């Protein structure tokens, strides 16, 4: 109540921000006449003037009014477009590192040019992030003309480019690209083996287009560069054959009530249960016993073994994936099968996600289910989430048509404030109340009837669905009624530009899966620009005028019919996606309308609002084809959407809390790699590593606080020989001859022995060769051990929830154990680097191509959206034969302990 009173007196925070920025708009407008008076060369010279002023101590805010005025005038000359006042406000919001919410058709692409130009003046680079390659090419190409006119360079990053092309694009003042390519290139940059292999510069400033799609919808999708891993395809096939024998648990609501009233234990009636909200599967006690029996029959486990024994965890993992594949992931909803491949469908945009694969064996399980070729499982070499990648930019901002519903999440996770920018013209779209049906069959009949009504008055219709399955079902119904229409979904994405360009034609019916992120406005009367482009450069003015006249007639006809009518065939889980669909109509003050159709057996209502609502309507006598327009029911449906949004927000925040732990470790590792790569040589670093290893050897085997009888001298000698190739008779040569030899003296002699090996190799092969080998070995070892650490962290994260059974906080336990693992990793990196360099030999002096060893550091292959193996420019180093001891074998020192608990503990 108090907040409302304050808002009435002083205006909301959003209104105050707009009012404050409007003062700067007046300054920019006052400069317009002086900019018009400048010729092209003088306008271009302003860029150099601004850069000079910045070097002399002025800030970007100081030059903002004049810089924005320059961009506005340049856009008029190059693009034929003039920034509106509200677009200037949007540009300032982006420059301030905030999110600008601008309605569809308000010119977000043009708004970005203001903040892009201003921030590019610093010379530190600006990244403009789009949702697909098409938009990156389109915007980078068209707006690149504007930036070039003003003396700035523009680069475009798309998948499939070679390293040199990407390096050039990143060194441009402004770089356009997709969110995934920027993220993958960050990982590739930090997997480089030499400075000239790096792609990116410092992450300075990014403007994210469709920011809600990338930072919220994609937040739980990790970017992973992976290499091949071992996989047992036959195991998946055998487990897949078991699925039909397992029954899904169906709960009896009456039994549930009796259990609650009588405090009785609920009787389980199936082998497994599913949770459609979280897409997870759980085994019942009955199912556990049944599955073990089936596994014994298949010969997958022994007679008396349990599914939960450590060695069978892999079986359980694969079986879980098979059950999820059959019962929670559906063809033409979650994925499509095309050209013998299972392709994921983005639930928010309806696009296929080329190159993306589900993890945890799920993708392989779906491939088995669909009978297509099973592709190899992968092992993570490097990964990062979008959340942590974009938070690394010094300044981040974004644009979207629908951010206000997620404003709290943007503020809480990314520290980004959302500012709603006023529209240039008032919105004329009419949003009708939802039409609510008992069953989907009645809903679809009503949708077809409304489409036919619109067609009769030649009003274009955009019919939005949440899945390919629904889009094809409605398409079949319209075909039976003889209604011509276009379908835009993941299966027809090749015709996307053509379908969207024609969606505003009189009487045009377009069915589309989620239109979020399509990036192209639906123009009433069709796309005039597309028609003029078809004429080509040789077209006469008369031909252009004829096309313009024909378009104007169609445009007026559509406006007379009521503009674009949007029909939502179902409510999406997120209100934001519904708003994006609505926003396709009524652009730039055009007329339009929207209406959603909801059935009480739609997935959203059924899963999150329960059967209570449907039961109540049936008792009131509502039939399948009856329809109601009830604000109460609509509020309940919105309540269900809020539940889903809250659930998804919690999931994203939970993921971030865990990923933050890995992110801090990632920063340390990548910084260490960067220091090694940039150093002329790492002799000092290697000296410190040898000293650290000797200290650990002493502490472990001959600790100063223990009497000599408790020292493990044999273990020390074995570790020196097996790990580092040092044959030192500590007992016979040192301690037997010098009984009073101190621990400090032993430490000095051991360090001298390590340094002697390095000196010997430098004398033999030369400093240059050993300096190169030191850097190369260090980078390879870091990459190899980091890869294993990522796998261990992933397993820890999957299992850590079990700590809650012991009344422990899983998050704290994860933080504690991951820290211990990381300390072990850093120690092991030092050990392996020194160990390998002690054993390294070269067949010929100063011939880097002839280095040999016994354990080659594996070459990193990168695969996700592409399988672009980054081959090292230097030859792989292999290691000389040294004695090998298995981790679980008895330690050769004779202690009687396992090697991993003795000499291998280092």
From Swiss-Prot:
One Pfam family in the UniProt entry: SEC-C
Keyword Transport (UniProt): yes
Biased segments, Low complexity type: 849-865
MF annotations from Gene Ontology: ATP binding; metal ion binding; protein-exporting ATPase activity
Enzyme Commission no: 7.4.2.8
Topology class, membrane: Peripheral membrane protein
Catalytic activity: ATP + H2O + cellular proteinSide 1 = ADP + phosphate + cellular proteinSide 2
InterPro entries, A to Z: Helicase_ATP-bd, Helicase_C-like, P-loop_NTPase, SEC_C_motif, SecA, SecA_CS, SecA_DEAD, SecA_motor_DEAD
Coiled-coil region list: none
Task of the protein: Part of the Sec protein translocase complex. Interacts with the SecYEG preprotein conducting channel. Has a central role in coupling the hydrolysis of ATP to the transfer of proteins into and across the cell membrane, serving both as a receptor for the preprotein-SecB complex and as an ATP-driven molecular motor driving the stepwise translocation of polypeptide chains across the membrane.
Region ranges (Disordered): 849-897
Cofactor binding annotation: May bind 1 zinc ion per subunit.
Cofactor section: Zn(2+)
Binding site for ATP: 87, 105-109, 521
This protein's UniProt keywords: ATP-binding, Cell inner membrane, Cell membrane, Cytoplasm, Membrane, Metal-binding, Nucleotide-binding, Protein transport, Translocase, Translocation, Transport, Zinc
Family: Belongs to the SecA family.
Protein name: Protein translocase subunit SecA
Biased composition (Polar residues): 866-876
One GO term describing the cellular component: cell envelope Sec protein transport complex
Compartmental location: Cell inner membrane; Cytoplasm
GO biological process: intracellular protein transmembrane transport; protein import; protein targeting; protein transport by the Sec complex
Gene (UniProt): secA
Residues annotated to bind Zn(2+): 891, 893, 902-903
Subunit details: Monomer and homodimer. Part of the essential Sec protein translocation apparatus which comprises SecA, SecYEG and auxiliary proteins SecDF-YajC and YidC.
